[in-house]
Every structure is written in structure tokens, then in C-alpha cells.
Amino acid sequence: MSGPDEPFHNLEKVLDELIERGYNTIRICAAPILLYGDLGVAANALAISSMGGAVGEGTRWYNPRGGITIDLQSRLFELLALAKKKSVWVILSSWEYQQSPAFSETSDWNDALMDIPPGMRFEVLAQCWVRMLEEIKARGLRDVIAYVELHNEVDLSLVGVNGRWTDSDHWDRKTSMEDAIGLLRSAHPDLLHTTSYGIPPFLHMDTAPSNSQVAHHHLYVYGVLQALFDWSQIRAEPPVYPTAEMKSLLRPDAPDFDTYRAGVKAWTLDATITPLSYLYASDYANGAAWDAWLYRNYALHELEMRRGIDYRLSAISTWSKLHGVPAVIGEGWVGFTPAASEFEDGPIGQEITQYAVQSARELDFWGIVVGSNRAPHHSGWSDISHQLSINEEFIHGGTRE
């Protein structure tokens, strides 16, 4: 989304806007393996593309226009230098085994990543981070780093496995993650190092790496949104999908699923690990129909969602205090809604946000997000007053009603 007229084309403008909204930190995929892993992929002339056809156009995260070429390393250091100029912190992360390569014109980046054996990926990541951090320091940019996150959502990515992460993987991958974090801590002891979970192991928090220096987790409560997913069978496969219920949530111009599927570049689905059925539902979502369903059914799930927020924040807070490290919610609160849906940006979504942020503050969390629908490429970015009030409340406090 860095092309002309796209949201991230002018990085200085983006940073000015986030400061205006009360933010002081950004979190990015710094692509450490691509830039410092000797993959043989030309990162200095990385061609950016859409996922093919209309795929991703109705989502909040998979809709770059493409058609541009980026010198990724130059772009990274431009951003870090601007962050230093603006006094903005940067959380360095990697989405390389989850989404980032899907927006490349070719599969070269993704293929090179997948050629690394799963059992070696955490170690390779750590080695690449070590080299990247050395260069960041050499350029005088060390002080903009809030902390280093080994990889985004290890449990919802391909960083440790080829396929879905199972319950046993929480234990099986713990040592590999601890070794990787240990390598980083040894090489760069002046920085904080951690990893992140998409669905934190709330019942088994001991499976999280014990040497993490930040308890970084994501908290999507879903609740009523999960009920919509279940009702519509959003993850079903043809011929069951799309169900009549799902069709009732689509625009009249939605093509049949087979026609839609023919437009996608198949390898990009492997790179995103996102079901095509979800992308289809988002790309052709009737936003009003989605929102009407969510509002009609919210009362059935309100208590469950609030309790879910309380329980999960408490589990994360307890772990962080036992280990003497700060706690951060790096993504959240409701879940992945189509771009056409305004539920999370509306009064109920804002109420959920306020409840979660107040709860996190009462538990002494170090950092939170206003919501994962608040970024320059989201419609909610235009609501300056809401973001500013939430950020000021987290920093300065408030009393729960």
C-alpha cells in the first residue's frame, strides 16, 4: 500500500497523523529474513502485487494495489529515521511466515522461506535479527526500537510448522523459541526481545518462552462475530460453501465461488494461510447485512465477550508479573470483519474497545492498541477524536462506568 495515492506512500505524513491521534508506537514487519538471510531474492527491487483478480479487495489487510517496485531496505531505514525524528517508538516484528510474501509479484520470497526446514526457522530468524540490529545500531537508530518480536503470531503462522499449529506444538516449539530469544538477548542485551501469540495459550501459559522480555499477545474476543462465522459456515468447503446463510451476507454482484477462485494466484493462499472462503466473504460482503446480524445478536454474547476480555487480560498479566516483564496487547479487540462492516467502528465496537483498554490499564499493561481496525488504510482512521480519547485515557487514566 505504498504506491502513489495509497495510504503509506508518504511515511512522514502517516507518522504525523498517528501522533495527531495520540499514538507513540508503530509495529512493523521488518522482513529480517528477506533483508538479512541471503535468500537470493532481490529485496532492493521487490515487485509488489495484489493476490490476483478481486481477491483481498474487500478485506482490511490483503488489498494492496500492486504495480510498484520497492527497495525494501531503503524503505525500512527511511521509516526508522523518520520515527527517530518524530520521537515515535518502533516494535520490530516479522510476518514473513504468515502474510508478507503473498504481496510479492512472484513466489520467490515465499519459496525461499519454505525451503528452510521448520525446525530451523526460529534459529534463522534470530540470526537475521542479529544482523539487522547490528546495522540499525550502526546507523544510529537503536533508540527508536521499543522491542524486537521474533515473529508475529507464532501459533497462527508457518514459522515453526508446515501446517496448522496444534496444542502439542505449544510445548514442542517452546525450546526452539527460547533458544532463538536467548541468541538475541546474548547478541543485543541492551534491547528487549520476545515473540507473540495470536491465540495465547491462556490455559497453559507456561508454554510461552520463559525468557521473553515482553509478554506480547493478541486478544481478539470474537464472541458475536464467531457466532456469525459459525452460523454462515464461513470456513466450509464447496459444495457446502457458500451456504444460503453466507449468501444472505453477500452483495448481489458476488460471482459464484468457482469463478472467484479462478482469479487467485494459488501460492498466495499458502503464504497467507487464510481460507479463500473468508476472503470471498469479505470481498463481496454486504456491510449492512453483516452489521445488522451482529447488532441483532450482540446481546446474546455481550457478557461472554466482556468475561473473555477480563479472563485473558488477567492470564497475560499474571504471567508477566510472575516473570517480571511488561505486558502488551499488540492486536485486538473484536476480530476480522470485512472492510465494508462498520460494527467495530460503531458504538458497540467502541464500547468494547473502551472496556478492554480500561481493563488493561487497571492491570498495568505497558501498551495496547485502540483496535486492529485503526490504521491509515482503514475507514476508522478518520475518527480522530475516538482514537485520541482512548490513547489519552490509557496514558492518563479514567474510571470504568
Placement of each model-derived feature along the sequence:
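Active-site mouth of glycoside hydrolases
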Residues: M1-P209, T243, R374-P376, I390-N391, ...
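Short, loop-centered acidic/histidine patches that primarily coordinate divalent metals
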Residues: R27, G330-G335, S372-N373
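A generic membrane alpha-helix/interface feature
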Residues: G40, A47, E105, I234-A236, ...
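Hydrophobic anchor at the start of a short beta-strand
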Residues: V90, A327, G367
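Short beta-strand and adjacent tight-turn residues that come in two discontinuous sequence segments
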Residues: I28, H217, V370
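Aromatic-rich peripheral "rim/lid" segments of glycoside hydrolase catalytic domains that contact
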Residues: S49-G52, A339-E401
